[in-house]
A protein has these predicted regions:
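C-terminal binding/interaction regions
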Residues: 8-10, 14-15, 93-155
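Alpha-helical segments flanking ligand/cofactor-binding loops in enzyme cores
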Residues: 51, 55, 77, 97-100, ...
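A short beta-strand-loop structural module common to alpha/beta enzyme folds
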Residues: 32-43
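Structural motif
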Residues: 42-51
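Short, Lys/Arg-enriched N-terminal segments with co-localized hydrophobic residues
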Residues: 1-4
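Glycine-rich phosphate/diphosphate-binding loop of Rossmann-like nucleotide-binding domains
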Residues: 9-27
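Helix-adjacent hinge/juxtasegments
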Residues: 52-90
Length: 155
């Protein structure tokens, strides 16, 4: 299921195996994937990967991104520092749906120490199908961007 999408993926060493599994899963479904690393299980600085991935989205190359680390939390914190990016951790179907329908998040963060690969694949099936549409949440998402712009201008 799901329309074909351009997706950028990234991880730290803790989630390298999960990233490889999910990358293949998404490619097998006909999605276009770019991998910003890491490419092995050597120690890495996950914020560098998050930064790289978010740039691919903010510059318009990719619609959505998936960031994987031990819990997804560090990746989400870092991604949300990038102006224009909305990222969330989701390991359940309701959060996954709301992160897009309510918050128009472009970046899904998951933890390799939290979720089994098979469960992550099932979540991705839903994630690919869900779209953001203007509606009751639009003023809220707009307000998020206003808050972001306020602090960006203060620097």
């Amino acid at each position: 299921g799901g329309i074909k999408m351009k997706i950028v993926v990234g991880c730290d060493e803790a989630a390298y195996k999960l990233k490889e599994t999910l990358k293949k899963y998404l490619e097998d479904k006909g999605n276009e994937i770019v991998d910003v690393g890491v490419y092995n299980e050597n120690p890495s600085l996950y914020p560098e990967t998050a930064d790289k991935l978010c740039k691919e989205i903010t510059n318009g190359n990719y619609e959505r991104g998936i960031l994987l680390c031990g819990t997804g939390i560090g990746m989400a914190i870092t991604a949300n520092k990038v102006p224009g990016i909305r990222a969330a951790v989701a390991h359940d179907i309701f959060s996954l749906e709301r992160m897009i329908k309510s918050n128009n998040c472009q970046v899904l963060c998951m933890g390799a120490r939290i979720i089994a690969p098979q469960s992550a694949e099932l979540l991705l099936d839903t994630w690919l199908d869900i779209k953001y549409h203007d509606g009751p949440s639009t003023p809220k998402v707009n307000r998020i961007m206003e808050v972001e712009n306020h602090y960006r201008c203060m620097r």
